[in-house]
């Protein structure tokens, strides 16, 4: 048995490996990028450090650790969970549509971010190779090649599942945060005046004295908080308490390191790659091990983000906002460990494309930030709407204040649009377009299918069944909901007289709870006709065959519908293409191939 202390520290260490990789690797590039925009004098450095500290307090600690993490569904968090909570509290259809669109936008921005984060993290770490003696003149193309090779190995590795190596992520990140803390402390001791930056008046003075230019610096300051949304999104994997406990340690490590980097800038105003230069000046002998540790930390950060993308896509599939895709479960005991091949390879291609396109990490910083601030702003709006409709109304002014600050950061980021920022919108527009076309297409398709109500269907069914030419055994027919009979079933049973001694309509409904499975077998809805209903949470992994066997249903054949869409509408043509390319219901639920019979129905849309 684990002692309480072991599970307490175990939870913290695990959180560091799975949640804090992204925000934990921000010190590699944040101040390096900001200092290209401002003078390295005491007034500017203290102002920027103060902005960084208070950004971490307001946008990560208050918005995510305190406000967002108080809103969970059975321990699950994230944009889709916020949408499910909010929709339950809304009454008008317009408000529901608005909440749905906000969720679509939030998910799309997060997925777009899933391309930029691995690219900037790995590239910025690899750029530290230039400080190794003899490699000072290493061409940028060589660095991109090294970064691309690391990315390729990282994405190929996904198929095996990260279960076995995930246990090493936590300890490596503990070493990383310890190194950041020690390095920062050593530097602060040399110039202790930087500690003044903890006072917010330095941030206010910086914004006041620098006007519009100071406001635009916020677009780079936000880099220190990228990955803050992971606290809430990954809540389902590890639980609220271990993540919040780990955040206190991570927060201290980050603040100490940023202050240390600030102290180093004051002593070395000409320094370029600040974190690497600081560590090299402190312990030149340990620079190469530190560089390897940095690369390991960025790989772990990218890994956590890839797992997060898989998780978001899976939630999107099961809540029907994304098309079905083939999902592999890579862990026998961790529900959250999944692999989606199509998403994995698309991400890899996009990451390498972005690396080649932007060349340097400071160029990539121009595209970074817009998606993050957009996600934070959307989270702020949704939280404010939720708190205003619950008993926690006292949190509304706080959530509103945070949302206004989010909006200020988002506005500051808009000036990045012409300098590469538009790429984060291009990347986000792809999943957004898929979600909008898919959800609207599904609704339009359902209307075009013209299903039959059960009572009308039973009139013909009973006559055919009574003739007695029934096939021995049990036939399963997948339907969307039991009282409604889809055209393919009418085609099979009524027109083709394919009728078994026992026929079972199977329907699967995903509930708005993350975890929960309820089954119900209704016998005798017609002669030799039963209905089997499964209500499952949207994060549940289902073994439908096992559930059927539990209720004594041993099928001989499984029928399912395939829609062949005929349309001249260009949008519905895109929908038809997505539908053809995506996995069908039976592939997604891993039903036995030898028993499957797909029945094609031609549908005009």
UniProtKB/Swiss-Prot annotation:
Task: Give an example GO cellular component term for this record.
Answer: plasma membrane
Q: Which GO terms describe its biological process?
A: potassium ion transport
Q: List the disulfide bonds.
A: none
Transmembrane regions listed in the UniProt entry: 17-37, 45-65, 96-116, 139-159, 169-189, 211-231, 246-266, 286-306, 338-358, 367-387, 394-414, 417-437
- Key words of the record: Cell inner membrane, Cell membrane, Ion transport, Membrane, Potassium, Potassium transport, Symport, Transmembrane, Transmembrane helix, Transport
- Is the keyword Cell membrane in the record? yes
InterPro entries cross-referenced by the UniProt entry: K+_transporter, K_trans_C, K_trans_N, Kup
Localization per Swiss-Prot or TrEMBL: Cell inner membrane
Which topology term describes how it sits in the membrane? Multi-pass membrane protein
Q: Which Pfam families match?
A: K_trans, K_trans_C
This entry's Gene Ontology molecular function terms read: potassium ion transmembrane transporter activity; symporter activity
Query: Catalysed reaction per UniProt?
Result: K(+)(in) + H(+)(in) = K(+)(out) + H(+)(out)
According to its UniProt record, which protein family does this protein belong to?
Answer: Belongs to the HAK/KUP transporter (TC 2.A.72) family.
| Function summary | Transport of potassium into the cell. Likely operates as a K(+):H(+) symporter.
The protein depicted here goes by the name Probable potassium transport system protein Kup 2
Q: Which organism is it from?
A: Geobacter sulfurreducens (strain ATCC 51573 / DSM 12127 / PCA)
């Amino acid at each position: 048995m684990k002692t309480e202390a072991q599970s307490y520290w175990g939870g913290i260490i695990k959180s560091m490996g799975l949640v804090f990789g992204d925000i934990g690797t921000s010190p590699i590039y944040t101040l390096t990028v900001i200092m290209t925009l401002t003078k390295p004098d005491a007034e500017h450095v203290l102002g920027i450090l103060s902005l960084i500290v208070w950004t971490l307090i307001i946008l990560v600690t208050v918005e995510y650790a305190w406000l967002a993490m108080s809103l969970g569904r059975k321990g699950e968090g994230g944009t889709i969970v916020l949408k499910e909570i909010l929709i339950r509290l809304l009454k008008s259809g317009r408000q529901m549509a608005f909440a749905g669109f906000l969720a679509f936008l939030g998910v799309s921005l997060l997925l777009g971010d899933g391309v930029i984060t691995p690219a900037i993290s790995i590239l910025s770490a690899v750029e530290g190779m230039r400080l190794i003696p003899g490699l000072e003149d290493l061409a940028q193309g060589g660095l991109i090649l090294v970064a691309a090779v690391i990315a390729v190995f990282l994405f190929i590795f996904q198929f095996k599942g990260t279960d076995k190596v995930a246990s090493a992520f936590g300890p490596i990140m503990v070493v990383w945060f310890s190194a950041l803390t020690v390095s920062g402390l050593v530097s602060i001791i040399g110039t202790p005046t930087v500690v003044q930056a903890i006072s917010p008046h330095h941030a206010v003075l910086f914004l006041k004295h620098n006007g519009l230019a100071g406001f635009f610096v916020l677009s780079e300051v936000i880099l220190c908080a990228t990955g803050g949304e992971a606290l809430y999104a990954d809540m389902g994997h590890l639980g609220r308490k271990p993540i919040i406990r780990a955040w206190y340690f991570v927060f201290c490590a980050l603040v100490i390191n940023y202050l240390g980097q600030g102290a180093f800038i004051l002593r070395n105003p000409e320094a370029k790659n600040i974190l690497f230069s600081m560590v090299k000046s402190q312990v030149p002998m340990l620079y190469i091990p530190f560089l390897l540790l940095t690369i390991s930390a960025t790989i772990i950060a990218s890994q956590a983000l890839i797992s997060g993308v898989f998780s978001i896509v899976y939630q999107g599939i099961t809540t029907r906002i994304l098309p079905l895709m083939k999902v592999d479960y890579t862990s026998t005991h961790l529900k959250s460990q999944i692999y989606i091949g199509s998403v994995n390879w698309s991400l890899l291609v996009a990451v390498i494309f972005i690396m080649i396109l932007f060349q340097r990490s400071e160029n990539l910083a121009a595209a970074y930030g817009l998606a993050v601030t957009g996600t934070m702003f959307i989270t702020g709006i949704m939280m404010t709407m939720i708190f205003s409709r619950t008993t926690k109304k006292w949190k509304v002014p706080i959530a509103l204040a945070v949302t206004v600050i989010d909006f200020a950061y988002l506005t500051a980021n808009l000036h990045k649009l012409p300098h590469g920022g538009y790429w984060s919108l291009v990347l986000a527009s792809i999943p957004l377009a898929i979600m909008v076309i898919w959800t609207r297409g599904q609704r339009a398709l359902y209307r075009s299918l013209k299903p039959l109500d059960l009572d009308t269907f039973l009139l013909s069914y009973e006559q055919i069944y009574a003739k007695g030419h029934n096939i021995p055994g049990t036939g399963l027919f997948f339907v969307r909901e039991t009282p409604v009979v889809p055209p393919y079933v009418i085609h099979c049973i009524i027109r083709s007289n394919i009728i078994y001694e026992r026929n079972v309509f199977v329907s699967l409904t995903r509930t708005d709870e993350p975890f929960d499975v309820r089954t119900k077998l209704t016998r005798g809805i017609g002669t030799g006709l039963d209905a089997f209903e499964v209500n499952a949470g949207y994060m549940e992994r289902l073994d439908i065959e096992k559930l059927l066997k539990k209720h004594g249903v041993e099928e001989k054949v499984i029928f399912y519908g395939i829609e062949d869409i005929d349309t001249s509408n260009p949008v519905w043509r895109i929908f038809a293409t997505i539908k053809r390319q995506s996995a069908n219901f039976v592939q997604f639920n891993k039903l036995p191939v030898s028993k499957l019979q797909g029945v094609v129905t031609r549908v005009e849309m």
